[in-house]
Amino acid sequence: MTKRALISVSDKSGIVDFAKELKNLGWDIISTGGTKVSLDDAGVETIAIDDVTGFPEMMDGRVKTLHPNIHGGLLARRDADSHLQAAKDNNIELIDLVVVNLYPFKETILRPDVTYDLAVENIDIGGPSMLRSAAKNHASVTVVVDPADYATVLGELADASQTTFKTRQRLAAKAFRHTAAYDALIAEYFTAQVGEAKPEKLTITYDLKQAMRYGENPQQDADFYQKALPTDYSIASAKQLNGKELSFNNIRDADAAIRIIRDFKASPTVVALKHMNPCGIGQADDIETAWDYAYEADPVSIFGGIVVLNREVDAATAGKMHPIFLEIIIAPSYSEEALAILTNKKKNLRILELPFDAQAASEVEAEYTGVVGGLLVQNQDVVAENPSDWQVVTDRQPTEQEATALEFAWKAIKYVKSNGIIITNDHMTLGLGAGQTNRVGSVKIAIEQAKDHLDGAVLASDAFFPFADNIEEIAAAGIKAIIQPGGSVRDQESIDAANKHGLTMIFTGVRHFRH
């Protein structure tokens, strides 16, 4: 009995050569629509789908393969006499191979001119149904959704006239992933269209971006997946201009870095980061000076770190960065001279180019945190804060310079691991206390790090001070201005301590925990 394949693809890469080889192996080919036209034009003889169904394509192609002559041919078990008899009684011929990929729904909704009606018309119905039928009956039917699998299938058919069960099972799993991801993307689109903030089912599609050597540690296996609907401002979308492949830890650190720099849009800014904590942030009228400040903030910790700049990297800035061992540099662009400097004898330095004009779109994405047996979902911490809404709770008002420095510090503290303390002036970070289990411990660490630069410095805390001992430590170090959320039942004790030492203190009313 001549074996039959059904081919209906939107991605026609390689399909003509594949179909020609099938014909050479003695297969009949059923096809539909544009695929049939392409194969016929290439001289590949095909059978029209309506010759199989006895029913014409209708409703602008919405109904063409949803027919017992198709699905019976796919689903009939070859080891079940009753199935084979039912097929014979109803003149259903068996189909042994299905090659289908689906209407380009993703590509359609990514078009800037897409309309709702166009998106709906690009939801495939018959394709997923055929794939699921073929995949369910993989004991006998081979299902192919990816042109990358054409060679394997043809090779096995040429060798043994059929594919192996192992291959059919693998391809069935791939087909089910394909249809599941397709439906998840449609669900994601419709959920957004109706503004459903808390859907009872969460379905998000990710595509494999990179198989990684290992994860956070060498004993951990890892991979990097990119959202099927990508954000341009993301490490997954960055263009790598130089260097080794990004590691698991590189990607996490780089992601943290590009989140921080989003809050410093107005002025040229450089962020240096290590282990997802900023070790230096510098802000100036030009990017070279901003680099100087970020480097001077902690010239020890920046070694082996990640640097992100929010302006084009020029030759002067590149010349200062080049002698330092850095893992990654990220910027919106690089001058030709800068790129030549940075890549000179630095073949491993990872240099990434990222479209900073897409930052706003990245801020609306939800954050996902895996826990054992579950997933936490939250909005990003991108609340708009207006300094005019902040409250000075002490007798002394901040000076103009202190106010500027406090705004800078408040932007920076949001990205320090809790319990987080940061000491800055109006243009650079000076000391950092991160990740301590008590707040006064973070205060002491930050003061120790900044001890030689405390003249005119200010301090920010990501959450309220639970006791006045924090204020006493700060005052003893000579720091005169504090910014914190407030909200402790002992706030008045902290206010009284600040007044006693002549400090100025602002309550923002917004906490910025970061775990």
Curated annotation (Swiss-Prot):
Residues 1-145 form the MGS-like domain. Transmembrane segments: none annotated. Keywords: Hydrolase, Multifunctional enzyme, Purine biosynthesis, Transferase. The keyword Lipid biosynthesis does not apply. The keyword Transferase applies. GO terms for cellular component: cytosol. Pathway: Purine metabolism; IMP biosynthesis via de novo pathway; 5-formamido-1-(5-phospho-D-ribosyl)imidazole-4-carboxamide from 5-amino-1-(5-phospho-D-ribosyl)imidazole-4-carboxamide (10-formyl THF route): step 1/1; Purine metabolism; IMP biosynthesis via de novo pathway; IMP from 5-formamido-1-(5-phospho-D-ribosyl)imidazole-4-carboxamide: step 1/1. GO terms for biological process: 'de novo' IMP biosynthetic process. InterPro entries: AICAR_Tfase_dup_dom_sf, Cytidine_deaminase-like, MGS-like_dom, MGS-like_dom_sf, PurH-like. It catalyses: (6R)-10-formyltetrahydrofolate + 5-amino-1-(5-phospho-beta-D-ribosyl)imidazole-4-carboxamide = 5-formamido-1-(5-phospho-D-ribosyl)imidazole-4-carboxamide + (6S)-5,6,7,8-tetrahydrofolate; IMP + H2O = 5-formamido-1-(5-phospho-D-ribosyl)imidazole-4-carboxamide. Coiled coil: none annotated. Its EC number is 2.1.2.3, 3.5.4.10. Pfam families: AICARFT_IMPCHas (PF01808), MGS (PF02142). Belongs to the PurH family. The IMP cyclohydrolase activity resides in the N-terminal region. This is Bifunctional purine biosynthesis protein PurH. The gene is purH.
